[in-house]
C-alpha cells in the first residue's frame, strides 16, 4: 500500500485552523513520538517515506504563540486559541464493523467523516471561529465539546479540544497489515452555528451543594450530641 496525503485534507485545514497561529503534526512509531510545528499558513511537508513507517496525526484546533513548540511537546487544552469544529469518534467494533454506516444516521449530519482504519472521526464544522482569548472561553468550549460528545454518543476518550486525529491518506499501524485512513463523507459547505448545536444539548449539570459541614476536629461526644438533635 502506497500512502499519500489526500489533497482535500488541506482544504479542511484551511477551515479548521482559522483564528490560530500554529499547529503541528504528531508522528509516532512503536518506540518514539515527536511533534513537527509550523505556522498554520505553511503546513510542513510530510515525506512519503515517513508515511510508510509512522502513524501521522494533526492538531484539529489551532494553537497560540504561547504554546511550547518543542519537538517532544504535544499540545494541550491550554494551547488552543480557536475552535472551528465539534468532533466525535465512533469505533467499528461498537457497530458490528460498520461505524461508517452509523455515521450516516447521525442528526445533525456531520460535515466530514474520516475513517481511521478502526472507526470514524466525525466533524461538525462551525460557520465562524470560536475564539479562545482566556480561560473562561476555553472552559466553555471544552465543556460544549464534552457535552456534544455525550449527546451524539461518541467514544468517551475523544472529547477534548486539544485532540489530534489521523491524517487522511496516512496509514494506521495499529493493524497488520496497516490500514489506510480515508475520507468517507465530504461536505465543507455543511456549516453549523455553535449556538444551534449547543441548543441541542441538555443543560449542563449543576453541582449540588450539601448542608453544613461538620469539622473533622469535633470530639466524639460532640458528634453524638449533634446526631441526637438531628
Regions found by a protein language model. Give the residues of each.
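A common structural junction motif
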Residues: 106-109, 146-156
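C-terminal accessory/tail domains of diverse enzymes
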Residues: 1-31, 76-77, 146, 186, ...
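Polar, glycine-rich mid-to-C-terminal structural blocks
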Residues: 176-202
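Short beta-strand
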Residues: 111-118, 155-160
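DNA replication initiation on ssDNA origins
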Residues: 1-85, 163, 171, 190
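Conserved short beta-strand edge segments in small beta-sheet-based binding/regulatory domains
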Residues: 56-62, 150-159
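Secondary-structure capping and boundary motifs in well-ordered enzyme cores
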Residues: 76-80, 106, 114-115
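Modules that initiate DNA replication and primer synthesis
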Residues: 84-85, 89-100, 104-106, 118-147, ...
